[in-house]
Amino acid sequence: MTKPSVLILGAGLMQRPAILSAKELGFRAVVVDANPNAESVFLADEFKEIDLKAKDEILNFAEELTENSNLKGIFTAGTDFSASVSYAGEKLGFSCHSYEAALNATIKPRMRKCFERCDVPSPKYFSFSGAEITEKNVLSAVEKLSFPCVVKPADNMGARGCRMIRSMDEAWRSVKIAAVNSRTSTVILEEYMEGPEFSIDAIVYNGTLTITGFADRHIFYKPYFIETGHTMPSKIDEKMRLELISAFADGVKALGLTCGAAKADIKYTEKGPQIGEIAARLSGGYMSGWTYPYSSGINLTAQALLVAAGKEPSGILGGRIPLKTGNKNFEIFDCPSKNVSAERAWISIPGKVKSLHIPEKESPVQNVFPRPVKEGGNVDFPRNNVQKCGNVITKSGSYEKAVSAAEKAVSAAFLRLEPNVSATDFFLSGKFLPDEKGFPPSAFSSFEKIEGLDISGKIPAGFSVLKDAENFPELKKLLELPEKDWNFLNALQTAERFDSICPGHPALDRLVFWKSLFRGGLQGAIYISDSCSDSENKV
């Protein structure tokens, strides 16, 4: 008898747990992706190059696999294409959400209409598509929403094209960028929700909803929404957690999700829970495939694959506990976490990479995932969640230890930039694009105070910048502030690190150096030193 197969959509890093779990469960892992060089292709038992949005091509291939390879189910995680899964899966009679429900959970205006119809808490919104996207329509909608509001592509993930609109001056260009990032040239404008944000994963199975992950999301850098990490499980108050779970369950019901994975990005606002979005799949961002398994001991991807293959997810059914949420739509359960897992990202200022230092994996660090950033490649301060430079994941019995270890590992990562690059110079100048006031932020808010200090003159070549700072009491006070930059170093640690890395630095203009450090952190400090050396060598 032919070994059973599952068809997995996507061959990137986020799909690696699915490919490995399928093989561990005894399935042939058949994988499709538009990119034959995707980083997890080598793990597949069989690979075919298919664009994940080509639903009819996926269906035809699935039909072939059903006839020839004993196909049992279709699956994805961490992609935009749960609708492609359901389109083929529904036609072939596999266990999955309906195609209509998957579309509801993919196309944001449809999602909002479902929530509206069922009184599910979510922000007020307007949507425009194609020729409807005019400056007049956009400005009228923005005026009705008031500031700040948010624009998103209707059908994209990873926060690509998503940003806050803080004034009329930012509105029209922001919407045009969002439209470019939409596969259907559709955008949604909505109220901004103020409050802490959370991610929830769940399995919908036989009329029950089982929570399989509830994490704190750490979102920064307005006007964009950059997730610098998440921590599993959340530290939220239990009463608030149950309210959020109940609202999530109402949203799952409103979308019509009945069989498979569901994930939510949700906030707790002054109005209570407000749903950002719900997807018909497991989460990406290292949550379902890494941090939840580390914290709970459950291979969630394997359990979701079992559901997709028409089998019982015994690994969650056996250990789940009932939750008393008062929800009328589902019997709700929870698979709680025993440990804490923290994921944190490291990021870069704009420039061109000269060299990379990747942090080592030392307990309790479980994984270090550098993004495909290469020497000679360009980097930028992220405007979406695809532009970060790498991630670390930890596991500990303590929330504080898991977070501390993740931050320490990130602080050890370093991208040295090529000297004398215009993008880096523009950033270090403290200037901003017209519609991005305040972005990218400075490494330290004290950057604005440096200009007013009387610190003219030169730091002698090879002289410790920390010792030099001792001669300037006001500068020393700024260095001793506890504020940390985006890679979890404070200003004092940054100066110490500079002294360690650049003991033979050239003579440095004192004001320019300290402005560069407070604006660009360690990268900025070393960049300005390297640029001085480069200029001297050219002379």
Task: Locate each region found by the language model.
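Short, well-ordered beta-strand elements within core beta-sheets of diverse protein domains
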Residues: 163, 191, 293, 388-396
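Short, flexible turn/loop "capping" segments at secondary-structure junctions
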Residues: 40-41, 151-156, 223-225, 284, ...
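Active-site "cap" helix and flanking loop/linker of ATP-utilizing ligase/carboxylase catalytic domains
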Residues: 243-264, 279-354
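ATP-binding N-terminal substructure of ATP-dependent carboxylate-amine bond-forming enzymes
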Residues: 1-101, 131-133, 312, 324-334, ...
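Short beta-strand-to-loop capping motifs
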Residues: 166-167, 202, 346-349, 392-398
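Phosphate-binding core of ATP-grasp and ATP-grasp-like enzymes
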Residues: 178-186, 191-233, 242-275, 279-288, ...
